[in-house]
């Protein structure tokens, strides 16, 4: 059971910026949570408590804000942290996955030796909207032989459908707070 006071603190710490980056969008700014040490600590503590007994061997965070939650979570769980990045940012041999955006395509990469067939992987990012980034990340992990069945997010925008998309891939989703709209 998650501490409701901590969850309320987390949600209250996330500022909403209207009409950013374009008119009609209500941007959920997770950096305001990071500025609040108590809220940031509560976020990591809730995630650790939820996942500490699940047997994960790696935490994978997506560029860039997934790193801010994934690295401290991995440290607290005592497992390795693996970054998934935009093309050309990782120095060793990589594999890539291209995915669709609303207006175009994007690509993510992971080191080929970062995940192996014995790894049980938790994926984390700051926000779940369409689920495209995490779908691509899951495909990369599975291509390397890793087992991935859980993804965690600080924020979810359930109306956009990302959770259903990930559940369709066999991913159990945890979101610490939900907001309406885009």
Curated annotation (Swiss-Prot):
GO terms for molecular function: adenine binding; adenine phosphoribosyltransferase activity; AMP binding. It is found in: Cytoplasm. It is an enzyme of class 2 (transferase). One of its GO terms (biological process) is adenine salvage. Homodimer. Catalyzes a salvage reaction resulting in the formation of AMP, that is energically less costly than de novo synthesis. Its main location: cytoplasm. GO terms for cellular component: cytoplasm. The keyword Transcription does not apply. SUPFAM superfamilies: PRTase-like. It comes from Shewanella frigidimarina (strain NCIMB 400). This is Adenine phosphoribosyltransferase. The gene is apt. Keywords: Cytoplasm, Glycosyltransferase, Purine salvage, Transferase. Pfam families: Pribosyltran (PF00156). Its EC number is 2.4.2.7. PANTHER family: ADENINE PHOSPHORIBOSYLTRANSFERASE (PTHR32315:SF3). The keyword DNA repair does not apply. Belongs to the purine/pyrimidine phosphoribosyltransferase family. It catalyses: AMP + diphosphate = 5-phospho-alpha-D-ribose 1-diphosphate + adenine. Pathway: Purine metabolism; AMP biosynthesis via salvage pathway; AMP from adenine: step 1/1.
